[in-house]
Structure formats: structure tokens, C-alpha cells
Amino acid sequence: MLPDKGWLVEARRVPSPHYDCRPDDEKPSLLVVHNISLPPGEFGGPWIDALFTGTIDPDAHPFFAEIAHLRVSAHCLIRRDGEIVQYVPFDKRAWHAGVSNYQGRERCNDFSIGIELEGTDTLAYTDAQYQQLAAVTRTLIASYPAIADNMTGHCNIAPDRKTDPGPAFDWPRFRALVALSSHKEMT
């Protein structure tokens, strides 16, 4: 899963125009976990790719008319079946966090990597998603070691606006998988 110029080799690439450069010399030091489903509560289909590439049809679903104007992206999406889709290289600034603050530092997009899980706040995430998220996180930590101590949810950096990844996300399970994966690599 080694990155190639900021792209995961195993990921399906769907380049987003919604990104820019990080501030000078800024390296990612935070992982932000999100969730997304489009239309809300529905999985599969082309709509997440369309949102992150600015091509979502506002007439395809009533909810899309509310979000078609957004210019947003994440670095990656992990679908329910474990497929990884990457939209923005890790060394660039994806537009996933919005108005945000982590441990007193604002503008989390400047120093974070955003990974979306296809899901909702209240529906359990899949085994494949946890396995892939742990694998991607391990890869990120190898390149950006500060992430090991800085993994959080969108709800924690924008608590007045966001609730994802929600109570359905099992943080202890995720952290154990990251630790287990890291331990396996060292032995």
C-alpha cells in the first residue's frame, strides 16, 4: 500500500479539483475520520465521486440540490466493501474539515488527512472498512509519524457542526487494529 507521489498504489484514483497546497513546510500530523453516504443512508453508486469532483447532478436527488454548490473533497473514501478511492494526494490539502480546531489549532485542513468511510453515524461499519482504514493509517504513520498520536473524528474538530463518524464507529477496535498492524510489521 506504499504511496506513489502521495497516492496509494492500491487505491482507485478519482482526482478531485477541490484541493490546494498545504502551507509551506506543513506535513500532515492529524488523521480525521469522517462518514458519508449519498443520498443520505444509501450506499454504492457514483454520487460520492461526483460530489468530490464537482460533478454531482442537483436534479438526480432532492438532497443533491442542497449540496451541489459545495467544493469539498477528502483524501480517501473507504467503501462498505473495503474499496479505497483516493481523490487528493496526501501531500496536498483536501477540503474536508471546514471550520475546525484540534487541540487549540485552527484550520485542520492545513495539517490533516481526511478519510471518509461510506456509512452513517448509527450503522455499524464493516470489517473490511476497519481493516482497510487500519492499513491506510499504518501507511500514513510510516510517512507522517505524528499521526500515530493524533487520530480523531470530524465531530471532535467541529463539534458544533458535525457528528461523524458517529457512535457507530468503534475507536478502540480501530486503534487496536492499527497497533496490531504496526506490531506485525515490526516482528
UniProtKB/Swiss-Prot annotation:
Disulfide bonds: none annotated. Zn(2+) binds at residues 34, 154, 164. One of its GO terms (cellular component) is cytoplasm. It is found in: Cytoplasm. It comes from the Bacteria. It catalyses: Hydrolyzes the link between N-acetylmuramoyl residues and L-amino acid residues in certain cell-wall glycopeptides. The keyword Cytoplasm applies. This is 1,6-anhydro-N-acetylmuramyl-L-alanine amidase AmpD. It comes from Salmonella typhimurium (strain SL1344).
